[in-house]
Amino acid sequence: MFQHITVLLEEAVDGLAIKPGGIYVDCTLGGAGHSERIVSQLSGGGRLIAFDQDDAALDNARVRLAPYMDRVTLVKSNFRYLEEMLLTCDVPTVDGVPQVDGILFDLGVSSPQLDEAERGFSYNHDAPLDMRMDQGGALTAYDIVNSWEEREISRILHVYGEEKFARSIARKIVQARENAPIETTGELAELVKTGIPAAARRTGGHPAKRSFQALRIAVNDELGAEEDALEEAVKCIRPGGRISVITFHSLEDRICKQLFASYVEKCTCPPDFPKCVCGGTGKLRLVNRKPIVPTEQELEVNPRSRSAKLRVAEKL
């Protein structure tokens, strides 16, 4: 069963300013919570197009969204191919570019992927090292820890995991694999612990948290996919349409913040103006200058939402 608590549900969907007859895209279907809220507000010619790489998520959506399937299109794809896939979904185009009214991203791994041991995402379960969101993908966490050079392992732990003990952990990994391959998440989690000083292991949550995050990002090229997809989202949103983006760690948020800023910096209109009138060439308006974060009530229900941030931008 695909059990998942949707993060910032109302805030992210309300940020899209849904029009009943509009065309909306959920780039990260997951448990279908955001999709259900979007599609329940559509009528007439309104449509929802939802992307996911995970067959379990798509199967779950067919059940959860069954009452609305006459206006839902499910697409198995990485969202980095947003423009290409929308062209296959019979949406209006302008100069060959598909145009929709709203696009939502809920980045990060869904709870079922974290909780199902066999997916190999979690340091809390002993399972084969995998971490692929798309089970058809070629690269796995096993490949990285058992075949990449020490300096490359250290680099991804430092850059993607912001792990201060990246060099020490990478050294422990390489030393261990000289004796036998590192095959499970449990083995890897124990190795990571040995690369972190005892004093540092007492604070900041599970000592393997940052390393597992780094490997997951590397396996799925998450940051590259995010950047590609946001660029395409800006192209595919029609004027007045909005992009809602939920991020879960500083690297994701930085990419979103900087990309949005690159499209608004040339516009000098006040933030409450509905459209650009200054003659600048900005393409976006920030709907919220500062990111929206979960309420205390949401945190009580879903502690995993603590690091979530929502940014919303509107096409000018």
From Swiss-Prot:
GO molecular function: rRNA (cytosine-N4-)-methyltransferase activity
One Pfam family matching this protein: Methyltransf_5
Swiss-Prot/TrEMBL GO biological process terms: rRNA base methylation
Keyword Cytoplasm set for record: yes
A GO cellular-component term linked to this record: cytoplasm
SUPFAM superfamilies for the chain: Putative methyltransferase TM0872, insert domain, S-adenosyl-L-methionine-dependent methyltransferases
Catalytic activity reported: cytidine(1402) in 16S rRNA + S-adenosyl-L-methionine = N(4)-methylcytidine(1402) in 16S rRNA + S-adenosyl-L-homocysteine + H(+)
Compartment(s): Cytoplasm
EC number(s) stated in the UniProt entry for this protein: 2.1.1.199
Keywords: Cytoplasm, Methyltransferase, rRNA processing, S-adenosyl-L-methionine, Transferase
Catalytic EC class: transferase
Sites where the protein binds S-adenosyl-L-methionine: A32, G33, H34, D52, F79, D106, Q113
Domain of life the protein comes from: Bacteria
Principal subcellular localisation of the protein: cytoplasm
PANTHER family assigned: 12S RRNA N4-METHYLCYTIDINE METHYLTRANSFERASE (PTHR11265:SF0), S-ADENOSYL-METHYLTRANSFERASE MRAW (PTHR11265)
Role description: Specifically methylates the N4 position of cytidine in position 1402 (C1402) of 16S rRNA.
Family membership: Belongs to the methyltransferase superfamily. RsmH family.
Protein's name according to its UniProt entry: Ribosomal RNA small subunit methyltransferase H
Source organism per UniProt: Paenibacillus sp. (strain JDR-2)
